[in-house]
Amino acid sequence: MSQYRCYMIDGRQTIVSVEILDVATDDEARHEARRLFFDRGDADGGFEVWLRDRLVERHATPLSVY
């Protein structure tokens, strides 16, 4: 298992929370991050998933720009 970090981001591109994802693969981390994002209401800008210093996925909602 690896510890991925999932940063939930609001519409102003501010981190509103960080979730630790204990999963085995990048695909599992992406899936869990999407589930968390759609279950939450305060992360309307998107999310980023990181494994150490490697960006695994960046998801931005249509109104947010990175």
Language-model-detected regions and their locations in the chain:
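Short aromatic-glycine-(Arg/Gly/Cys) micro-motifs in beta-strand/loop hairpins
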Residues: 1-16
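Generic alpha-helical hydrophobic packing signal
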Residues: 5-7, 32, 48
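A short, exposed loop/beta-hairpin motif centered on an aromatic-Gly-Thr core
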Residues: 15-24
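Short acidic, gly/pro-rich beta-turn/loop elements at beta-sheet edges
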Residues: 16, 31, 59
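A short, charged, amphipathic alpha-helix used as a generic interaction element across diverse proteins
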Residues: 24-44
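Short, mixed-charge low-complexity intrinsically disordered segments
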Residues: 39-66
